[in-house]
């Protein structure tokens, strides 16, 4: 099952409480999408957090729901996304490699 990882750093003028609330709203919007098993955020320091979302196959590659997109922009107003990755489990990685090499 793929995992989406993103790291967010608070903008200088942003309120930490508002940033946490925006991250929670994004997680809730993600969990409401079909195929998403879990979405949570974790503080990694006083000014940064990480979001982890576990979802089925193509859900993470598809456009987000309108609610998830709005929540993503709301978080973006308060924090800068400094990195984002999608992690594949070993079987998915091997499947992708096999398709690429026919």
Regions found by a protein language model. Name each.
Residues 87-102:
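Short, low-order "capping/linker" segments at domain edges
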Residues 2-9, 39-69, 102:
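Short, well-ordered beta-strand segments in beta-rich or mixed alpha/beta enzyme
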Residues 28-37, 54-89:
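An amphipathic, aromatic/His-enriched active-site/gating alpha helix that lines ligand/cofactor pockets
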Residues 9-21:
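Short, surface-exposed ligand-recognition loops at beta-strand->loop->(often short) alpha-helix junctions
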Residues 16, 35, 50-51, 81, ...:
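Amphipathic alpha-helical interaction segments
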């Amino acid at each position: 099952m793929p995992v989406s990882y993103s790291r967010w750093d608070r903008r200088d003028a942003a309120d930490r409480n508002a940033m946490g609330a925006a991250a929670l709203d994004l997680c809730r919007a993600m969990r409401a999408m079909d195929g998403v098993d879990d979405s949570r955020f974790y503080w990694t320091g006083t000014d940064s957090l990480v979001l982890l979302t576990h979802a089925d196959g193509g859900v993470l590659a598809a456009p987000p729901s309108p609610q998830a997109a709005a929540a993503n922009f709301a978080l973006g107003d308060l924090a800068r996304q400094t990195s984002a990755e999608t992690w594949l489990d070993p079987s998915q990685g091997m499947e992708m490699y096999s398709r690429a090499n026919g």
